Design a protein with these regions (language model features):
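Amphipathic alpha-helical polymerization modules
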Residues: 1-232
């Protein structure tokens, strides 16, 4: 950059420092989101991907991917707390359309509809909402096997009667035939707090270093401007 009077000031350093701080801020945000999601059921860790062009593109050179490893399994006394012990997602339907989730904390309404905690309908492997033809007095009368077949006890026949298979799909929406469903379990996040904090430290140091560089370069620019003012 050429300043009036013929004095030149290199602005690339300031721009590079600002861009680097923006990138570091985004990386810190991703890590903070993972730390916040540590104790959330069904949360999957986000991983920031830094491209080789990030130095020039800034935050536009960043992207995130989802770590689809299975999280921590914890036993639940609720028969409608269901988890997937493999990769995959439950399919649900709301007014906003079809969504996928790893959060298998379900409930039953008075009509026998299988719902998520936010009242979305849980879909079967045929893409239809699951509805029990018998609403049991005790949720323990509902059984779900490892292939996702939901059955309910019929007190009249004293037998379990199949209702539907839970619709479990992969990241591309393709149906998974052997999803390894576990009834009476909650899957907490696959986040490792130790790994998140370890990865956070160099990013914070890099942010602080770029902030110091920016302040130094900004002070130098102010001196140049001040000298120009004195010269005139």
């Amino acid at each position: 950059m050429k300043i009036n009077g013929g004095i030149r000031f290199v602005e690339k350093g300031i721009t590079a420092s600002i861009r680097a701080m923006h990138v570091d801020s985004e990386l810190i945000s991703v890590t903070n989101e993972n730390i916040t999601g540590f104790d959330k059921v069904g949360y999957q860790r986000k991983d920031a991907v830094v491209s080789s062009m990030t130095e020039f593109l800034g935050v536009h050179g960043l992207s995130t991917t989802v770590d689809d490893k299975v999280g921590r399994m914890q036993i639940s006394p609720n028969p409608l707390d269901i988890s997937i012990a493999s990769k995959g997602y439950f399919q649900t339907q709301s007014a906003e359309g079809i969504k996928v989730t790893r959060d298998g904390r379900f409930k039953l309404d008075k009509e026998g509809n299988l719902l998520t905690l936010d009242d979305s309908k849980v879909l079967s492997n045929t893409g239809m909402p699951i509805k029990l033809h018998i609403v049991p007095d005790d949720l323990k009368q509902i059984k779900i096997n490892d292939r996702g077949l939901l059955s309910v006890f019929n007190p009249t026949t004293c037998k379990l009667e199949g209702v539907a298979y839970l619709g479990v799909v992969d990241a591309d929406g393709a149906l998974i035939m052997d999803p390894k469903v576990k009834q009476g379990y909650n899957e907490f996040s696959n986040v490792s707090l130790q790994e998140e904090f370890v990865s956070l430290m160099p990013v914070i140091k890099n942010f602080d270093a770029n902030r110091q560089l920016f302040m130094i370069q900004n002070q130098n620019l102010q001196k140049v401007i001040s000298q120009l003012g004195s010269a005139t």
